[in-house]
A protein has these predicted regions:
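Glycine-rich, basic loop-to-helix element that forms the pyrophosphate-binding segment
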Residues: 61-82
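Conserved donor NDP-sugar-binding/catalytic core segment of glycosyltransferases
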Residues: 95-131, 137-138
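Short, flexible, basic/aromatic active-site loop/helix in glycosyltransferases
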Residues: 138-164
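Non-catalytic, C-terminal membrane-associated alpha-helical segments of glycosyltransferases
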Residues: 256-313
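Acidic helix N-cap motif at the loop->helix transition within catalytic regions
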Residues: 19, 44-52
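A short, conserved alpha-helix in the catalytic core of glycosyltransferases
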Residues: 164-183, 187-217
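Short, acidic, metal-binding catalytic loop of nucleotide-sugar glycosyltransferases
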Residues: 23-32
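Short beta-strand-to-loop acidic/aromatic patch adjacent to the donor-nucleotide binding site
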Residues: 84-95
Length: 313
């Protein structure tokens, strides 16, 4: 008997994108799976429309947008409560190869020391280009980075690799592990929550693995770009706020004491460059967002005042 997998998708006003993802998932070879779609406070009726079109999926409805973390946590909670063996978190703006889940489950079953595994991820617009070929962390610099971004697939990306953190675009983990670590940090809302969970899993002694033979394709950018350009560009100031605030939270939580001086200096320099760029380009709403992110990141303030960073189109 195959281990059971709950495939967790979060939909927010994205009927076409989520529908394409579900259609792709219907072609997978792994039989013992259930698609669990969390409708994250959609205002366009897309959640109910998708359930009507795909009655076999499980629909969980949230009255409000709980962010990437809160939405996926609703799916994790359902998966754990229903007794699934595994949870697969999958961004709704993805397409999958039919055998992608077979590879991930079989690898986890054969390697009990592995706590979480991710597929090889390509861009969807050009499937010859990688989006993520493994993710790493420099504790001395306090920087997160991925390998292979926007590069052609080569031999080094076709090898199994232990990585420092797993992208939240797609990963498989055991529910028994989630019971120990806890779920995604809800106060992070979105961005770097995958890093935080990865570090918690690693702290339990598990390995984090990149699987080169499990392949998916990512549209990318759905969560951080608006469809129309505002006065300060396509990227909402909230994105910059959350990215920098959560970056500082991670640094405070996970930087070893002996790396604090170098990591602090590098991140002061990096954030100063961002602020300088916004000042020169006269993107003052975004500049204000980054300043607030630094204050809240250092103080530990949790509730972001999103309204402060809204910009007029």
């Amino acid at each position: 008997m195959q281990p059971t997998v709950a495939i967790i998708l979060v939909n927010w006003n994205s009927f076409e994108v989520t529908n394409d993802c579900i259609i792709s998932l219907k072609e997978i070879q792994y039989a013992a799976h259930t698609i669990v779609m969390v409708d994250n406070g959609s205002t366009d009726g897309s959640g109910k429309q998708l359930k009507q079109l795909h009655p076999e999926i499980v629909l969980i409805e949230s009255a409000t947008n709980q962010g990437f973390t809160g939405g996926n946590n609703l799916g994790f909670e359902y998966s754990i409560k229903q007794g699934f063996d595994y949870s697969l978190l999958l961004n709704n703006d993805t397409f999958v190869e039919p055998d992608f889940l077979n590879h991930l489950v079989n690898y986890m079953e054969a390697h009990p020391k592995v706590g979480i595994v991710q597929p090889r991820i390509h861009f969807n617009h050009d499937r010859s280009l990688l989006w993520n070929g493994g993710s790493y962390y420099s504790k001395w610099l306090g920087f997160l980075y991925t390998k292979g971004f926007n590069r052609k697939t080569s031999a080094k990306y076709l090898q199994f690799k232990e990585v420092d953190w797993i992208t939240g675009c797609a990963f498989l983990t055991k529910n028994s592990i989630l019971r120990k670590t806890g779920l995604l940090a809800p106060n992070m809302f979105i961005y770097s929550e995958d890093v935080d969970l990865s570090f918690r899993i690693k702290a339990l002694g598990y390995q984090l693995m990149y699987h080169p033979h499990s392949v998916i394709y990512h549209i990318a950018g759905m969560s951080n770009k608006s469809k129309t350009k505002g006065k300060e560009g396509f990227v909402n100031p909230i994105v910059h706020y959350l990215n920098q605030r959560n970056r500082i939270w991670l640094l405070k939580k996970y930087t070893p004491w002996y790396c604090v001086p170098t990591a602090t200096l590098c991140n002061i320099f990096y954030i100063s460059l961002i602020m300088g760029y916004f000042a020169v380009r006269r993107r003052f709403t975004k500049l204000k967002a980054v300043i607030s992110a630094v204050k809240d990141g250092l103080s530990g303030h949790i509730a972001p005042a999103f309204g402060e960073f809204s910009e007029k189109k």
